[in-house]
Amino acid sequence: MSVLQWLFEAQIQFGSKSISYREIIGGLLGLTSAVFGLKRKVFAWPVGITGDALLFTVFLGAVFSFGADDQEKNFYGQAGRNLLLIFVSIYGWIRWTQHRKSGAPGTPAVVPRWTTTKEKMVLVPAIIIFYTLAYQLFKSLGQTGTWLAVDTWIFTGTALATFGMSRGYVEFWLVWVAVDLVGVPFAFS
């Protein structure tokens, strides 16, 4: 068995449930990336990208199953979320590197602030439109069932929170909490 095959097939059983090593490793890499980010270390970017790439394969389980019977579902919102985070991380890595080279030590790349009323008036309709389009896209790709709306919110909320982070909006933390309030029960179901 190759290392790649092992990575894609290995699981830990918890009673009648199982979790893939990819999901565990991807989650641990995400946590490691967050710690590196708090310490302002450049390693946050490649570690986070690697973790998101692994999690991308988890949520497109039917595509990356290598014939395993237990991975017949794709969660396009979750997979899209990880793809979005990969692209944003690449952008962040480039911006971080540019900012570090600009010769302005000690100055933040983004200054945190609350959104203005005008920004909220643009963001709220944009979120509704984004959610509606993502919902229709995931539905057209064959995603069905009760989790279609949940998966779409996870993707939409992640896009919104990530955009908010890039702009320095303080409210993005509230959006991350809302994503987690939906996403954590989703992960355990």
PLM features per residue range, with description:
Residues 1-46, 50, 57, 67-70, ...:
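Polytopic alpha-helical membrane-helix bundles and their juxtamembrane interface segments
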Residues 53-56, 86:
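A short structural micro-motif
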Residues 67-93:
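Individual alpha-helical transmembrane segments in multi-pass integral membrane proteins
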